């Protein structure tokens, strides 16, 4: 192989091309690579933060769900207690009302019984006077013997 001027010229041109590339082409390429590398690193950091935020959000949502379930269970328990209380109050009110109605009925029965007893006493007194009249064959003055009849009726 002969080293001639063409080879030297090509070597010089190649060397100038390499210098030109190092001076003008290489820095923007390196800058683009560094920028891309930075964007990728930022994207990875953002993805990591997003994953962490997602995990925290899921944890918070789970906690809120547990709190909501506990609160719902508490509300249900309070509703059950209130329902039981209402039923007990209704029972007590019904019992009091039944006792009142029973006492009122008892008083009415007592009144009716006393009225019937008084009516029977009066009838018994009249029957006794009529019976005595028939037995004695004479008329007995009712006004004169009213006190006697009332005593007799009271004893009965």
UniProtKB/Swiss-Prot annotation:
Subcellular location: Cell inner membrane
Transmembrane segments: 12-32
CDD domains: ATP-synt_Fo_b
Topological type in the membrane: Single-pass membrane protein
Sorted UniProt keywords: ATP synthesis, Cell inner membrane, Cell membrane, CF(0), Hydrogen ion transport, Ion transport, Membrane, Transmembrane, Transmembrane helix, Transport
Recorded GO CC terms: plasma membrane; proton-transporting ATP synthase complex
InterPro entries xrefs: ATP_synth_B-like_membr_sf, ATP_synth_b/b'su_bac/chlpt, ATP_synth_F0_bsu_bac, ATP_synthase_B_chain
Taxonomy, superkingdom: Bacteria
Gene3D superfamilies: F1F0 ATP synthase subunit B, membrane domain
Principal location: membrane
Keyword Ion transport: yes
Gene Ontology terms for molecular function: proton-transporting ATP synthase activity, rotational mechanism; proton-transporting ATPase activity, rotational mechanism
Database matches in Pfam families: ATP-synt_B (PF00430)
Oligomer and partners: F-type ATPases have 2 components, F(1) - the catalytic core - and F(0) - the membrane proton channel. F(1) has five subunits: alpha(3), beta(3), gamma(1), delta(1), epsilon(1). F(0) has three main subunits: a(1), b(2) and c(10-14). The alpha and beta chains form an alternating ring which encloses part of the gamma chain. F(1) is attached to F(0) by a central stalk formed by the gamma and epsilon chains, while a peripheral stalk is formed by the delta and b chains.
Function: F(1)F(0) ATP synthase produces ATP from ADP in the presence of a proton or sodium gradient. F-type ATPases consist of two structural domains, F(1) containing the extramembraneous catalytic core and F(0) containing the membrane proton channel, linked together by a central stalk and a peripheral stalk. During catalysis, ATP synthesis in the catalytic domain of F(1) is coupled via a rotary mechanism of the central stalk subunits to proton translocation. Component of the F(0) channel, it forms part of the peripheral stalk, linking F(1) to F(0).
Similarity annotation: Belongs to the ATPase B chain family.
Name under which the protein is recorded: ATP synthase subunit b
Organism name: Pseudomonas syringae pv. syringae (strain B728a)
């Amino acid at each position: 192989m002969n080293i001639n001027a063409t080879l030297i010229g090509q070597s010089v041109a190649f060397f100038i091309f390499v210098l030109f590339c190092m001076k003008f082409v290489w820095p923007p390429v390196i800058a683009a690579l560094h920028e891309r590398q930075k964007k990728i690193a930022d994207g990875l950091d953002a993805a990591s933060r997003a994953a962490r935020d997602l995990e925290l959000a899921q944890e918070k949502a789970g906690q809120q769900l547990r709190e909501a379930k506990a609160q719902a269970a508490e509300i249900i328990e309070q509703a059950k207690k209130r329902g039981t209380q209402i039923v007990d109050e209704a029972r007590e009110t019904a019992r009091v009302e039944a006792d009142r109605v029973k006492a009122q009925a008892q008083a009415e029965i007592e009144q009716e019984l006393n009225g019937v007893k008084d009516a029977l006493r009066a009838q018994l007194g009249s029957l006794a006077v009529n019976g005595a009249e028939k037995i004695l064959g004479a008329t007995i003055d009712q006004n004169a013997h009213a006190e006697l009849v009332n005593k007799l009726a009271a004893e009965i």
